[in-house]
A protein has these predicted regions:
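C-terminal motif of bacterial Sec signal peptides marking the signal peptidase cleavage site
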Residues: 11-14
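Beta->alpha turn/N-cap motifs
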Residues: 35, 65-69, 79-98, 171, ...
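Bacterial signal peptide processing site
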Residues: 16-18
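Extracytoplasmic small-molecule ligand-binding "clamshell" domains
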Residues: 20-89
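Acidic, polar ligand-binding/catalytic clefts
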Residues: 74-131
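Short loop->beta-strand "edge-of-pocket" segments that line small-molecule binding or catalytic clefts
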Residues: 29-35, 130-147
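Pocket-lining segment of extracytoplasmic ligand-binding domains
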Residues: 124, 136-239
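An extracytoplasmic/periplasmic, membrane-proximal ligand-sensing/linker region
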Residues: 26-48, 54, 236-292
Length: 292
């Protein structure tokens, strides 16, 4: 009886293990999206990507949109994340702590870099970054390079001290706060115009505020920042990483992929990348004290 029970338990464990293999319905590949823009846009994009990947790879996927960048970083630390579309700073932290790998980079109209932009209302009297001194200012998130870290470094280096600062948590929220006069100035991501249309964060609220280009002006730009990466858990099977990367690049070239990615921070494509492409920014973040 004991022998039969032992054999049964071994077989049961084996079946359970098989059911729990990564990519099965019981253990889908867990794909996280950074909450940098409106959740509805993220849901639209992630749903389309999930549908495409499940049709073009042999695996199942589960999409998650947490409340912060850091939640994604820690999800890698507890093996709750396999892939993530993450901001550059979050990736740098996750790479340092958990060895995640950057395999893909977003591309915007052929550009693989972007910048931070300082914004102010056109009627505010704020004409340059130095005028922010003593004013109320909105940042995006403490883990955002374009929405906090590099702008903060500029302010500190030039001895510019806002009277009050707030975190809006999303780039479009910052633009809205500046537009509505809730703050005097703010910082968000910037990409140059394409075909006569703005591609910076103001574009995200243009449907709601058609005159945002006239009401909210750019008063300064930062140095170049590499575009956000798609990252993978370091011990995820290499076959999976390669296949998923190939299919994601193909997805970005489809009509549906182009539609959902473009509405998401003006992304127009995905290209291969490596951790080395982020070394310069990694060094800058370390200099800022962003990595202990």
């Amino acid at each position: 009886v004991k022998l039969l029970l032992t054999v049964f338990l071994v077989l049961l464990c084996g079946c359970t293990h098989k059911r729990s293999e990564l990519g099965t319905a019981d253990n889908p590949i867990k794909f996280y999206f950074v909450p940098s823009v409106d959740v509805r846009l993220l849901e639209d994009t992630s749903k389309a990507l999930k549908t495409y990947l499940e049709a073009h790879t042999p695996w199942k996927y589960k999409i998650s949109i947490p409340q912060s960048y850091i939640a994604i970083v820690e999800a890698f630390g507890t093996n709750r994340a396999d892939i993530a579309s993450l901001n550059t700073y979050g990736y740098i932290i996750a790479h340092e702590k958990y060895g995640v790998e950057a395999r893909l980079m977003t591309e915007r109209f052929g550009d693989r870099v972007y910048q931070a932009q300082f914004l102010a209302r056109s009627d505010s009297g704020i004409k340059k970054i130095e005028d922010i001194n003593g004013k109320k200012m909105a940042f995006v998130d403490p883990a955002s390079i374009s929405g906090y870290l590099l702008p903060l470094k500029y302010l500190n280096d030039h001895h510019i001290k806002p009277k009050e600062t707030v975190f809006a948590m999303k780039h479009d929220n910052v633009v809205t706060m500046v537009y509505q006069g809730q703050v005097d100035a703010g910082v968000t991501f910037y990409s140059p115009p394409n075909e006569g249309q703005i591609q910076d964060a103001r574009r995200l609220v243009k449907a709601q505020f058609p005159d945002v280009e006239q009401k909210v002006k750019i008063i300064g730009l930062s140095s170049d920042i590499p575009n956000d990466p798609i990252i993978f858990r370091k011990d995820m099977p290499e076959e999976m990483k390669q296949k998923i990367c190939i299919e994601m690049i193909k997805f970005a070239k489809t009509i549906d992929g182009q539609r959902v990615l473009k509405q998401l921070s003006s992304v127009t494509g995905l290209v291969p990348t490596t951790d080395k492409d982020y070394d310069e920014t990694r060094a800058a973040v370390k200099a800022l004290g962003g990595i202990k």
